[in-house]
Amino acid sequence: TPSGLVPLPALRAALPQLTAGFTGLADGLASLKGSDDHVLNLTVGSVFASRWLIWRITKFSQAHPDIELRLNVSATMVDLSRPDVDCGIRFGLGTWPGVTAELIGGTSYQPVCAPPVAQRLKSLGDLAQVPVIQDETTMLSWDAWRSEVGLDPAIRLNGPIYSDASLAFDAAISEQGVLMAADMMSADTVSDGRLVRPFKRPVEGPQGYFLVVAKGRRESHKLRALRQWLAVEVPAS
């Protein structure tokens, strides 16, 4: 019409409800955005979560009370481009496609065991006389360690096999045998005496723990806070 578009009677009757609905949707999206601004969604592996991060979350919360840390614990690499994931911490070479990876630590590793098991290990060759716990998920190499420290390759290493790294740690703590572990992951249990490093012969591997972020993702306040906190906390552990 000359005066412009005229809504049909049915639409005119529904306008108040539609307006209220759109207003509610806008308010909900604004509320969601505000929540996202202070929630840091972090995906990690089980051993990193249970052996290192869980004992230090309180420190992060105290340093950054405005940030709520939400953990997604997964054995596989989560798609970091998802809107509900801000970043992750993963163990490997740091060459995953589609992400930027920053090494935070965990490159040195060596055998650990409970003190009673360590009493049976007077020399490297004694590893043939105790169970060697096998972690199917680990990238840490017994062969590389053997070569580095000069352990006879003919010595067979046998023991229980676990498909979960955290359970393998529990097995070592419960005196089931010797486990190859990253120094960063065994630091707390060594500090409190539940585990010891019987040979004190660490080696440096090509793998480590990386902070990973989807390529192209902006540097948010919460991500920057985590990065800075890790830079201080990891060397101290």
Which residue ranges define each predicted feature?
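Alpha-helical "hinge/linker" immediately C-terminal to small N-terminal DNA-binding modules
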Residues: 5-34
